[in-house]
Design a protein with these regions (language model features):
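Cys-dependent protein tyrosine phosphatase-like superfamily
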Residues: 2-130, 143-205
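Glycine/aspartate-rich loop-and-adjacent alpha/beta segment that forms the canonical ThDP
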Residues: 140
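Substrate/cofactor-recognition hotspot
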Residues: 137
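Short cysteine clusters
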Residues: 134
Length: 205
């Protein structure tokens, strides 16, 4: 009986250690989740693209304040409502950030000029944290980020499209956006507006 008790005691001790480790890991996860929820308040569908490039949906006032606290220096608005753009511009600039509008409708594919304008902004401000958004942070924002992945980072189209879906791209009602991204490598090769982004021989696969 004593042996059984010692064995039971050993098992109990082992389970206690495992339980303690699991509890510690779980607590760490919970703290991390709380921190993330706090950081993302007012920033729907938020994500980090690179060290200095962020994406998301339409921010609230709290969200813009959070972006400012994160060190973001430029907000790029892809929404097409001129009044909303003007209102956001005042709010963003009151916090000391620069506001840039590249308006277009998610019901249509973007023009080459609009894509180039965004890519040029990012390239011209390598040390500035930039936040780009539309209404949901999914369709127009998804296209801009996919274009960045392909034109600047030379990522495969499939990888860029997968990222679009991860941020809730509306593939059912806006299939033209995916088709545009699938056509982008050809545009980079042949459209003069993308002259600065023509792929180098080493990046052509």
């Amino acid at each position: 009986m004593a042996k059984i008790n010692r064995r039971t005691s050993g098992v109990t001790g082992y389970l206690a250690v495992v339980s303690l480790i699991a509890g510690t890991l779980l607590a760490g996860t919970q703290v991390s989740s709380c921190q993330t929820e706090k950081e993302l308040r007012g920033l729907p569908n938020f994500g980090r693209v690179t060290e200095n490039l962020y994406r998301g949906g339409q921010s609230t006032s709290d969200g813009f304040s959070a972006l400012h606290a994160m060190g973001v220096g430029m907000v790029v608005n892809l929404r097409e409502d001129r009044a909303e753009i003007a209102t956001e511009k005042r709010e963003v600039e009151s916090l000391g950030m620069k506001s840039v509008g590249i308006p277009w409708s998610a019901n249509h594919k973007p023009s080459s000029a609009q894509i180039v304008e965004f890519l040029d902004l990012v390239r011209a401000n390598p040390n500035t944290k930039i936040f780009v958004h539309c209404r949901r942070g999914a369709d127009r924002t998804g296209v801009m980020i996919a274009a960045y992945r392909i034109a600047v980072e030379h990522k495969p189209v499939a990888e860029a499209v997968t990222e679009m879906h991860r941020y809730h791209y509306d593939w059912l009602f806006r299939p033209q956006l995916k088709r545009y991204i699938e056509s982008l490598p050809g545009l980079l090769q042949n459209d003069p507006q993308f002259a600065d982004y023509h792929p180098q021989p080493s990046s052509v696969r």
